[in-house]
Amino acid sequence: MQFVFIVIALFVLSLMFSSTYVTEDVLSSSSLSSFTFVKKIPQEDTSEIQIFEPEGIDVDSEGNIYVNDIGTNRILKFSKNGTYVLSWGSTGSGNGKFNHPHGNEVDSQGNVYITDQDNQRVQKFKSNGTFITKWGTPGTGNGQFMHPHGVAVDSKGNVFVSDRDNANIQKFTTDGKFITKWGSEGSGDGQFIQPWDVAVDSDDNVYVPDYGNNRTQKFTNNGEFIAKWGTEGEGNGQFKQPAVIAFDSADRMYVTDSENHRVQIFSKNGTFITKWGNEGSGDGQFLKPESITVDSLGHVYVADTVNNNVQLFISN
């Protein structure tokens, strides 16, 4: 009998310490039932490549990973294997310098867009960190920003920027010429309280995690309201400060649910699919996960801001 209890105890312990996180899957057709923790980035612990406060994260077509580190005001680039490649940026207001680089996006040409939050501008770079252009000044007018937060690029190269404090989304050409904007502060359709990010799906529809309203809103490419979902809470499809949205190749939508310390996945129409993560500093746990991206192979990278790392997951 004692042997049986020992076997059972060992089995329970193996479940507790497994790196595979079983998720609650309500759509069998989604084929997403669990996510396996792979590793943290960076794995090396040197001052040159240490991440202090990761916020923005994205991947390019070759699988290279770009991380905004607001703790050092620089951008770090890693290979698809997580090996450090290069970094650029420092504190300041000149070209290629930053004051809280919050969001990032890599377009189909490999250009990197950074929302330089406290410099009230967007900067555009080549993939090696070479400065290309910038736009934006402080203010509330067209092409001006108070706190530019998220950035996204559609299939035509148009650039969308969410402005947290102006409570709007602005649309620009690839070189920063203003096209249109929408949004105001409030809780109605098409209104926002701190729009934290902006993302586009394969049809170029626009999605905004409405951080202060604990919901996600969906729009046409020119800002016409389509739908919304989410309420405050801890249940499936509920949020506590949804931060960043990313899409995979199947147009499934991944949302970092910051104060719930988890990631939720939805269809692009807002149907809940699955979730994973809980509060903590262990593998597969999060402390206010800020940003997320999915590469062409379905690998999921989460910028775990307070834990000062990036975590890589694969779906089973």
Predicted region positions:
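Secretory targeting signatures
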Residues: M1-E24
